[in-house]
């Protein structure tokens, strides 16, 4: 576990089915069967559950020729139905992204804006608590460790509900191109983009108090290289701020928008 004093062991099986409805709509539904054990020298927590899950995506971008303009909306749910207890949990995630080309030349300048929201329903145990920090939430902040978690002054970084607002500027430096390698005639991509980002996030254990605390903010820059199958790889350097305090963090790059 990233910050609790447990070693995690997972046994899992997963089935998902999905399809496109036209060019812009995609739906997926499925479930996981999982057994997770969190253990240390003094205690063992065991969870045995089935996890129904699904998502719906609406995407107006031309992701193959021009993904720099359009709208991307993602709705998703993930739940736990435990076999050994009456506990049932549900997480509902929402993401709304907007893209616009400010400069439409070959080396484009694109603005992107995203609003994300996650909320949980049910009796959520501490091993499932969410956090802010890292490339998937608020960049410029590290993923919390046990030292951060046990310090009561850092309680603002953990919760069951969060909202994140992100803005990015993306400048194409080397336009993406495709070439064929000599080995098995595989096709590869190359290109390079630079980004600047600002993230602002709120998190709380109570939904009604979500926006009652000072937000966590991150600002920084990074680089992106296209990679087949996984989209892009990159590197970010960001500064995290809350109130008047701030510190720099270097991390693997991943766009939130």
Where are these regions (language model features)?
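A structural signal for short secondary-structure junctions
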Residues: 158-161, 185-192, 213-218, 225-230
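Short, solvent-exposed loop/turn segments at secondary-structure boundaries
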Residues: 40-43, 86-88, 208-211
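Outer-membrane beta-barrel transmembrane domain signature
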Residues: 106, 168-176, 193-219
């Amino acid at each position: 576990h990233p910050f609790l004093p447990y070693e995690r062991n997972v046994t899992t099986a997963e089935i998902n089915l999905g399809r496109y409805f036209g060019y812009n709509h995609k739906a997926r539904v499925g479930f996981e069967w999982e057994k997770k054990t969190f253990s240390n020298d003094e205690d063992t927590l065991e969870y045995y559950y089935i996890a129904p899950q699904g998502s719906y995506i609406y995407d107006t971008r031309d992701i193959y020729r021009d993904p720099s303009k359009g709208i991307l909306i993602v709705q998703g749910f993930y739940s736990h139905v435990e076999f050994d207890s009456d506990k049932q949990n549900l997480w509902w995630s929402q993401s709304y992204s907007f893209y616009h080309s400010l400069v439409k030349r070959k080396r484009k300048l694109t603005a992107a804006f995203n609003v994300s929201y996650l909320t949980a329903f049910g009796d959520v145990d501490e091993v499932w608590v969410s956090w802010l920090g890292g490339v998937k939430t608020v960049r410029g902040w590290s993923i919390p460790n046990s030292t951060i978690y046990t310090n009561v002054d850092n309680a603002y970084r953990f919760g069951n509900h969060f909202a994140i607002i992100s803005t990015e500027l993306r400048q194409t430096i080397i336009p993406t191109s495709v070439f064929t390698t000599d080995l098995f005639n595989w096709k590869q991509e190359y290109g390079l983009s630079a980004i600047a980002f600002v993230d602002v996030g709120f998190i709380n254990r109570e939904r009604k108090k979500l926006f009652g605390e000072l937000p966590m903010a991150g600002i920084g820059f990074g680089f992106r290289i296209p990679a087949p199958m996984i989209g892009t790889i990159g590197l970010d350097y960001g500064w995290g701020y809350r109130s008047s305090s701030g510190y720099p963090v270097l991390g693997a790059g991943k766009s939130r928008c």
